[in-house]
């Protein structure tokens, strides 16, 4: 401690370089320093903004088209953001116009598909805007050899996880992958979640889904998330199930070298 420091140095201070978690914030008397308090308020504001940010489905559809992917823009039964937040049940189902759109698509393309990819804003459209395309790029690279047929990417406004079950059932999809913005945390306003379901249908519980969470640069890399998803998909096709009876036992032979702020190692073990 010196004349410029009102409190002794925190011995945990060095760990701050190894994790984005709020540790070793310091103190001024019995309170947080001004800088730490302002950082907390800023992170809280970012989380609130992420929840209420509008889903730019048109922009995402255009970007998908530029990469050769068709898309369908649908809407859940929740008419607006306020209703979506107040009525989670409505976010799990499609509205009537969207149901009609999917039925017409299924009639024009009979026989079903192996995979339906659904993208919904969830509680963080920011996560969807930032991470959907990079993840799908890595997924396509790794899945090319499997030869699965897929439906157009379905973009659902005001959607929750279970809406993918209805999408998959209407399209006759053997599997669904839901990409959705996770509830923002105070250090992660842009975390993307992935939910995989085999044999989707309306009414399934979370026990029938597998989750891969925290897909973002500071969390799970796009390539690693795609690797884990493909393991689940291949095992699901072999065993004809998903959820609690299907464990992620994918082997990881090497760490990826992606431009990522996550390459800091485990803060408990230090850098390797």
UniProtKB/Swiss-Prot annotation:
GO biological process: amino acid metabolic process; ethanolamine catabolic process
S-S bridge residues: none
Enzyme Commission number(s) from the entry: 4.3.1.7
GO CC, alphabetical: ethanolamine ammonia-lyase complex; ethanolamine degradation polyhedral organelle
InterPro entries: EutC, EutC_C, EutC_N
Pathway: Amine and polyamine degradation; ethanolamine degradation
Function as written in the Swiss-Prot or TrEMBL entry: Catalyzes the deamination of various vicinal amino-alcohols to oxo compounds. Allows this organism to utilize ethanolamine as the sole source of nitrogen and carbon in the presence of external vitamin B12.
Family note: Belongs to the EutC family.
Subunit structure, as described in the record: The basic unit is a heterodimer which dimerizes to form tetramers. The heterotetramers trimerize; 6 large subunits form a core ring with 6 small subunits projecting outwards.
Entry protein name: Ethanolamine ammonia-lyase small subunit
The organism of origin for this protein: Pseudomonas putida (strain ATCC 700007 / DSM 6899 / JCM 31910 / BCRC 17059 / LMG 24140 / F1)
Lineage: Bacteria, Pseudomonadati, Pseudomonadota, Gammaproteobacteria, Pseudomonadales
């Amino acid at each position: 401690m010196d004349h410029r420091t009102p409190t002794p140095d925190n011995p945990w201070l060095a760990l701050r370089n190894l994790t984005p978690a709020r540790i070793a914030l310091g103190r001024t008397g019995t309170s947080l320093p001004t800088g730490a308090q302002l950082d907390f308020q800023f992170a809280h504001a970012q989380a609130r903004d992420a929840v209420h940010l509008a889903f730019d489905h048109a922009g995402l559809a255009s970007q998908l088209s530029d990469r050769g992917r068709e898309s369908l823009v649908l809407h859940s039964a929740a008419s607006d953001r306020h209703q979506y937040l107040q009525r989670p049940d409505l976010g799990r189902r499609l509205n009537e116009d969207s149901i009609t759109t999917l039925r017409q698509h299924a009639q024009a393309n009979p026989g079903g598909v192996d995979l339906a990819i659904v993208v919904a804003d969830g509680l963080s459209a920011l996560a969807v805007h930032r991470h959907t395309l990079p993840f799908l790029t890595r997924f396509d690279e790794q899945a090319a050899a499997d030869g699965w047929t897929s439906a157009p990417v379905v973009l659902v406004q005001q959607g929750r996880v279970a809406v993918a079950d209805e999408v998959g059932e209407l399209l006759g999809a053997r599997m669904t992958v839901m990409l959705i913005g996770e509830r923002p945390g105070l250090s992660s306003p842009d975390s993307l979640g992935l939910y995989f379901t085999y044999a989707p249908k309306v009414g399934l519980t979370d026990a029938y889904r597998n989750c891969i969470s925290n897909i973002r640069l500071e969390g799970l890399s796009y390539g690693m998330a795609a690797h884990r998803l493909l393991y689940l998909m291949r095992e699901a096709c072999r065993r004809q199930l998903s959820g609690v009876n299907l464990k992620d036992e994918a082997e990881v032979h090497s760490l990826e070298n992606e431009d990522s702020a996550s390459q800091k190692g485990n803060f408990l073990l230090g850098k390797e």
